[in-house]
Amino acid sequence: MKSTVDDIRRRFDADVERFSNMETGQSATVDAPLAMALIAEAAAATTPHARHVLAVGCGAGNYTLKLLEQLPNLDATLIDLSQPMLDRATERVGRATTGSVRAIQGDIREIELPDQGYDIVLAAAVLHHLRTDAEWRAIFAAFHRALRPGGSIWIFDLVESSIPAVQQLQWRRYGEYLTRLKDDGYRDHVFAYVEREDTPRPLLFQLDLLREVGFAQVDVLHKTVCFAAFGAVRG
């Protein structure tokens, strides 16, 4: 049985410091600093006149801070399950922008987003907690509605492969990365909480779904092993 929302919240409540490191990002995630930089640059390039960013699963605020290096002084709305994460993100983002900062603690599946309220949506290492195809469709459709025309969404996340044999290959290579990072025990620890907590979908599934809910342009910034950075622009 997969972790409940409360289980996930408690784990992140206790892990604020690890998610506050701008240099390493989340070390268990392959190429996290590169993905963070690519997403910030792509968001700025596609939505240069943005005024308001929505960060879903904002964690300690790293992705929002990286975006503010490219597009200074945006208004920011931050959403996270974890109140300690949200408190840290609000503090850090508040110091980095002259714009307004609004914090919302809760589950994105239960939060009603305003129509055309944002210019950029960031969703980093959060959507793999969605459970059913219906939830994925509903959330992607909500993101599309929440963006103003010309707005963009940028995602970095754990993804599956569409071909089972390739999934096994990528998972083996990810395990080798984790062992090199620390040791076999750390690999087994990460694999255990992914199995317990996460329900990722293939990159191709998500790209197709972005198109289906109405995004006009879809592209991939980076794909390595079982992680991908990608995005879409609303017409």
Language model features with spans:
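A short glycine-rich, Lys/Arg-flanked "PGG" loop and its adjoining helix->strand segment in the class I
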Residues: 137-149
